[in-house]
Design a protein with these regions (language model features):
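Chymotrypsin/trypsin-fold serine protease catalytic domain
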Residues: 86-165
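Acidic glycine-/aspartate-rich tracts in secreted/extracellular proteins
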Residues: 35-37, 54-58, 99-103, 131-133, ...
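Conserved catalytic-core segment of clan PA serine endopeptidases
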Residues: 1-3, 9-14, 45-103
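Extracellular structured ligand-interaction cores
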Residues: 3-5, 16-20, 26, 45-47, ...
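Catalytic histidine site
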Residues: 3-55, 148-158, 165, 210
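C-terminal cap/linker of serine protease catalytic domains
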Residues: 191, 197-213
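Catalytic nucleophile loop of clan PA
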Residues: 167-193
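Short, solvent-exposed aromatic-acidic interface loops
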Residues: 36, 66-76, 132, 167-170, ...
Length: 213
């Protein structure tokens, strides 16, 4: 399942942004909406490139450019600065991709993770992504270069919002909360993606996937 998860790069005003993402079916990836659309300026980012199994600059399966991204209307209608309570439950995006430089599709190269809806709020999750710092803004070794994994039990934060304790910071956004993951076994279902953190606390927050979103 490690090959399903990768680093997402994209163009933002004045530079490049980074998030995490996961390959899903029909040659799409799932990530956080704030990695796609800025509610502060009502601005779509651009040039999204998903690199599954990214490792220290390496792209073993190639990179895949997004051809389209979809977010919830509720996210696009938000304005102002991000708030975990009231915003996280809309913070998800799905993007379709073209082929890599070898002409291969995303699903041909890495397969895809399953998705799970309407699960209970309390679950044991594996949280994955490419953070460059921890929740205290302390830089991690080889920041953003390697996939990191944390496991913890989730809890209900607000309606359709989950929380769990992991010491990951920026760059983890969009990474999957996975159920049924096991190393070296091709299994796992995405039930949330990383949305926000509280600096100084070992907490991550994410949308709870339901049949309504």
């Amino acid at each position: 399942p490690h090959m399903w998860v990768g680093r997402l790069s994209f163009t933002v005003p004045g530079g490049t942004g980074y998030c995490s993402a996961t390959a899903i079916s029909n040659n799409h990836f799932v990530t956080a909406a704030h990695c796609v659309y800025d509610t502060t300026s009502n601005y779509w980012y651009s040039n999204w490139y998903f690199t599954p199994a990214y490792r220290n600059g390496g792209a073993p399966y190639g990179s895949f450019r997004a051809t389209s991204c979809t977010i919830l209307t509720a996210w696009q209608n938000l304005s102002g600065s991000f708030s975990i309570n009231g915003w996280t439950k809309y913070d998800v995006a799905v993007c379709g991709v073209g082929t890599n430089s070898a002409g291969k599709t995303l699903n041909q190269m890495v397969g895809w993770a399953g998705r799970l809806w309407n699960s209970s709020y309390v679950k044991n999750f594996f949280n994955m992504g490419y953070p460059w710092n921890d929740t205290s803004n302390y830089p991690l070794p080889n920041a953003g270069m390697y996939l990191r994994i944390c496991t913890a039990e989730s809890r209900q934060q607000t309606t359709d919002t989950l929380g769990m304790g992991c010491n990951f910071g920026g760059g983890i956004s969009g990474g999957p909360w996975m159920i049924g993951y096991a190393p070296n076994v091709t299994s796992g279902w995405v039930n949330s993606v990383n949305s926000g953190i509280y600096v100084g606390q070992q907490n991550l927050y994410g949308i709870r996937f339901t049949s309504n979103n």
